[in-house]
Structures are given as structure tokens and as C-alpha cells.
């Protein structure tokens, strides 16, 4: 049976395609955030582990943020509270981490 692309039975395929398209749009933003975090961390003389601990997140999660990838093929999408905790630990404004980014 062939299900037309707009049919409700084919909604999963449509969502997957849309999600992939959104991921592609978010890659540059996730990578830019990762670079900004890395630069700010290095400027403060902190290790990834020390910054993660100060922000209350795992080192593994922080490493994923710097890389910009949550799992293979998926851009990182941190919570606002995580961004605030990292900005606080780095003694920078959240805007310095995310300001000026666009798709």
C-alpha cells in the first residue's frame, strides 16, 4: 500500500523530514555556541571539568556543548537554565554566549 505524503498515516515520515531540516538549520548555531563556550572557558583558565562542576552539569554534557552535538547527527540544544549556569560560572552575560546568532 502506498500512502500519500500528506496522509495522516504518513505523518511520522513528514515529521522526521521536518526534524532533519530543523537540525540542519541549527548546526551553525550549536557550533558557534560551542566555540564561544570554549573561548570563554579558556580565557578564564578553566578546564572543561572545572567549568562543568561550577555550572552543576556533567563533564560529558559540557563536552557535548563545546562540540555542538548531543549525539551523532544531532545538534546540541541546551536548556536555558544550563546556559544561565554556564554564563554565571564564566562570569559573562548569557548574551555573550548566544547573542547575535541566527539561522
Task: Name every feature range the model reports, one short phrase each.
Residues 37, 48, 83:
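Generic structural marker for isolated residues within well-ordered, non-membrane alpha-helices
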Residues 41, 52, 87:
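The alpha-helix within a helix-turn-helix
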Residues 46-71:
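Short alpha-helical DNA-recognition segment
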Residues 76-96:
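DNA major-groove recognition helix of helix-turn-helix/homeodomain DNA-binding modules
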Residues 102-103:
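Helix-turn-helix/homeodomain-like alpha-helical modules used for DNA recognition
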